[in-house]
Amino acid sequence: MKPKLTVLSLGAGVQSTTVALMGVHKEIPHMHHAIFSDTGWEPQSVYDHLQWLKPILEENGTQVHIVSAGNLRKDALGENPDITRVASMPIFVKNPDGTKGLLRRQCTLEYKINPLMKKQRELVGLKPRQRWKEEEHHRMDLVMGISWDETQRMKDPNVPW
């Protein structure tokens, strides 16, 4: 069995950057890996910040992985001929009765969470569709930065790490 890993879910915002730098400064345990899930449609400031942060993490022993499920903007605009359906984005719409509504959000799952999960499984040595054995649970600690005003986003994981 592989040794236990500590992996940061890196959004390159304030919270995950703070956690990453706390690891660099040894205020919290070392993180072996950091994973950034690129939608292809992040603000330029996020890419600039990631370009600044990545070498700091790598110089301190944290391997940074950039994963992607494609370019959300191009997929949504139909610019990718290989895409037959696009995950819905939280876009404001006008309903047939004239009321305002919000489309259901699927893009976070398909363009952020699924690529992160795929990389996490790879890091712990699981092949596609391979199941965990009970004695192999808890091979990874996943670290996420969530501020106090976002505690409603915290959930128990649906995976055994």
Q: Language model features by range: what are they?
A:
Residues 1-161:
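ATP-dependent adenylation/nucleotidyltransferase module used to activate substrates
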